[in-house]
């Protein structure tokens, strides 16, 4: 299994250039590039071609653009903006050699019926699939374990991607989001491992279902999530591609960028290596 770094882990104590430097130094294979902040910040002082050259001349490679945010159940203007943003991402993927775009469902306090969420998600993902196909890019849908997210359990997200039924549309499996809204391990056991494109590893403090938020995440293996169950099940269903460490903990942002990146690797490898060669 390959090791990836998700830039949320150093959101407030680093930038893309430093993330790349330290991830390369500490032996990461991939990086998920944050398109809402770290990439635009980088492009203020660098050309995209410089980033492409960096990846061509170093071990670390770009795994995903993270993320196309709130893709479903938008009004007409919002939908057009999503499509245009995604088309721009395709050109970035082409230049950098990025394999995936992470797509995050709408977060809202508005109550939307599940059938309407599914219908919109399937329609938009099918449209995105058509756009991505010529580029060879895959779409990884990330359900979010918050009550306000329109797609917040594994079973709901899996049903959507199976209904889309495209080879280039699958899931991000995030241990925090799976745990946070009480997703069922039995549902994961029945899933096709080929429909999981990226595994986000993390852990969390032990708050009740519905109360957990991203800032509650802790180093893998140091919290309440049964990561052994997640990893053993992922192995059983045939997933073995890439693990990406993604934390949002404010106290970790007070560390140096290098210490955060080094500790993220050490804690991830310690947990994952019981089940996968990494």
Curated annotation (Swiss-Prot):
The record's free-text note on cofactor binding: Binds 1 divalent metal cation per subunit.
Pathway(s) per entry: Polyol metabolism; myo-inositol degradation into acetyl-CoA
Annotated GO MF terms: isomerase activity; metal ion binding
Catalytic activity reported: scyllo-inosose = scyllo-inosine
Binding annotation for a divalent metal cation: 142, 174, 200, 246
Pfam families to which the protein is assigned, alphabetical: AP_endonuc_2
Residues passing through the membrane, by range: none
Keywords on record: Isomerase, Metal-binding
EC number: 5.3.99.11
InterPro entries: IolE/XylAMocC-like, Xyl_isomerase-like_sf, Xyl_isomerase-like_TIM-brl
Enzyme class: isomerase
Cofactor(s) recorded in Swiss-Prot or TrEMBL: a divalent metal cation
SUPFAM superfamilies listed in its UniProt record: Xylose isomerase-like
UniProt similarity note: Belongs to the IolI family.
Entry function: Involved in the reversible interconverion of 2-keto-myo-inositol (2KMI, inosose or 2,4,6/3,5-pentahydroxycyclohexanone) to 1-keto-D-chiro-inositol (1KDCI or 2,3,5/4,6-pentahydroxycyclohexanone).
Name this polypeptide is given: Inosose isomerase
Species this protein is from: Bacillus licheniformis (strain ATCC 14580 / DSM 13 / JCM 2505 / CCUG 7422 / NBRC 12200 / NCIMB 9375 / NCTC 10341 / NRRL NRS-1264 / Gibson 46)
Gene name per UniProt: iolI
């Amino acid at each position: 299994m390959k090791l990836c770094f998700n830039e949320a882990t150093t959101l407030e104590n680093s930038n893309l250039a430093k993330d790349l430097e330290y991830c390369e130094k500490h032996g990461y294979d991939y990086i998920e590039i944050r398109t809402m902040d770290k990439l635009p910040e980088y492009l203020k002082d660098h050309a995209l071609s410089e980033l492409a050259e960096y990846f061509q001349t170093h071990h670390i490679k770009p795994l995903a653009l993270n993320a196309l945010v709130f893709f479903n159940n938008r009004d007409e203007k919002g939908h057009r903006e999503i499509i245009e943003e995604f088309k721009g991402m395709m050109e970035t993927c082409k230049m950098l050699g990025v394999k995936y775009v992470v797509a995050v469902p709408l977060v809202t306090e508005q109550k939307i019926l599940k059938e309407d969420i599914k219908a919109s998600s399937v329609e938009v993902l099918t449209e995105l699939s058509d756009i991505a196909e010529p580029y060879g890019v895959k779409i990884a849908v990330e359900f979010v374990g918050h009550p306000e997210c329109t797609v917040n359990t594994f079973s709901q997200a899996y049903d959507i991607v199976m209904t889309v039924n495209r080879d280039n549309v699958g899931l991000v499996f995030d241990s925090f989001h799976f745990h946070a809204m009480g997703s069922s391990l039995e549902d994961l056991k029945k899933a096709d491992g080929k429909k999981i494109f990226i595994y986000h590893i993390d852990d969390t403090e032990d708050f009740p279902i519905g109360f957990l938020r991203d800032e509650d995440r802790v180093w893998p293996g140091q919290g309440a999530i049964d990561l052994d169950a997640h990893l053993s099940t992922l192995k059983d269903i045939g997933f073995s591609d890439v693990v990406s460490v993604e934390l949002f903990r404010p106290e970790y942002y007070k560390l140096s960028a290098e210490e955060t990146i080094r500790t993220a690797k050490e804690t991830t490898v310690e947990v994952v290596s019981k089940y996968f060669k990494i």
